[in-house]
Amino acid sequence: MKIPLANLLKKRQQVETAFLQDEIIGIIYLMTEDMVLHGGTAIWRCYSGKRFSEDLDFYSPTFPSLTKHFEKIGSSRGLKVTEVKDTGNVISSTISNGKTSVKLEVNHARKVEGSITTYELADGIGIEILSLTPDQFIEDKIDAYSNRRYVRDLYDIYHLVKSYRIMASTRTNLKQFLQTVQRPVDEPILKSIVYMGLAPTFDRMVDEIRRNIA
């Protein structure tokens, strides 16, 4: 029998955050069906990741017209939406329930066709949402790691390459990526966000990625 996520997380604050993420997901899919979840939380919840992630990141061209409705529904459930900003491409906000908060970012400038994917709720139940494929995530994470060298991005690549069949074109891009990959700027933090098993070292992740794409 599968153990619910809430029982696996290391910290109470992580559990509270996970349940708040689920509540926000529920509100979002009440309003629209075009929201495509991406980022670290999507990999964690949709692709059996073992890395805790705080933020919710979406693609949706329709969200700008729904922000007031989102705030209204959230308020009716005791949630507070603050720090709302629109850069012209991305709407960001912070959603709080009095115990914890989650940052929500919606890219409304980029239209992405999502794939129907099972999202695992904190209580262990699965629901269908739109997200990216493993190959799409890897391409995004290659770009992210190349730009900022955060260990979480390399870990996500490592997890996906180990766990899923990857397209030939993605393997080619990974081989090119590994030729010049540099150490992360924040490697020690991985131990605090990987909540099951050992946190792999940089060398272990690079070796494992290379082995799986050979």
Predicted regions located by residue number:
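Structured mid-to-C-terminal alpha-helical surface segments
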Residues: 1-35, 46-56, 61-214
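Glycine-rich beta-strand-to-loop/alpha-helix junction loops that act as flexible
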Residues: 37-42
